[in-house]
Amino acid sequence: MSYNLLALVQQVTSELNLAIPTYVAGNPSQDVQQILALMNRAGYDLVKEYDWQALEVEYRFYTTAVTTTCDTTNGTYILGNIPSTVGLDSTYSIVGTNVPQDTYVDTVVDAHTITTTQLSSATSVGGSVTFSKTIYDLPPDYETITDNTHWDKTKHWQMLGPVDAQQWQWLKSGYISTGPRVRWRILGNEFQIWPPYNTQEYLGFEYRSRGFVKHATGQVKNSFTADTDTTVLDDTVMVLATKLKYFQIKSFDTTALNQDYIRYLNVAKANDKGSATLSFAPQPSAVLIGWANIPDTGYGS
């Protein structure tokens, strides 16, 4: 079981021959406040240092889409007479009668009316329209994405990406903008997909969390704030990193502390998760989705 924040700080102060505190959060001692800040800094640095298995998280979510009807007026931004606009916002793409490609909800005017980001190309009454959410929030503890883990679990297809800016605009603006495979990119700190779904799909990917701290109730946190908080990272690494940073900030000689820290950090990395067994006669790598496993008939069905 991991030490809590109080125990970690007490270990640091004991090893540095400083006054050992009885509490950390709210402690007026400048040394305690500084050690708390440095321990958080050590955590932030360690998050970026390595793909710790304790910080690797699977993220899953369902896409949202609704097909309904609306009225359009040529040359205006207004879609009216929608049965309900509940839940719609600017993260929804619009595909429908007289609605140009790559059009999004701009504002929700009332329970039956919205404005869009592009002008309607013609006038119609009761035309079909699909509102599809293509922009999704990243998890609150998101640090970085894990490559090649993005899947449409409903269709059992890997999602393609990250798409660069030029490809993205080509997909959203070109004549051929849709296909059976979903593309993705991270834009504006949001997870975006294309083309828009017209049905609910189950998507997922893995990411590295920056939540190296856990509240006593199990809630993931990005910093130590309470004495009962624990870390999912190695306690000894946290103690050694904090001691090293304390000496650095005081302009003390850090040679010995740095050697101890690097030595133990390398051990912690080596022991953090298993490694693949390497063969002197390896077989071809596993095929994901390609020509080798696309059926001759019934493609996409």
Language-model features: where?
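Short alpha-helix capping/helix-loop boundary micro-motifs
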Residues: 75-83
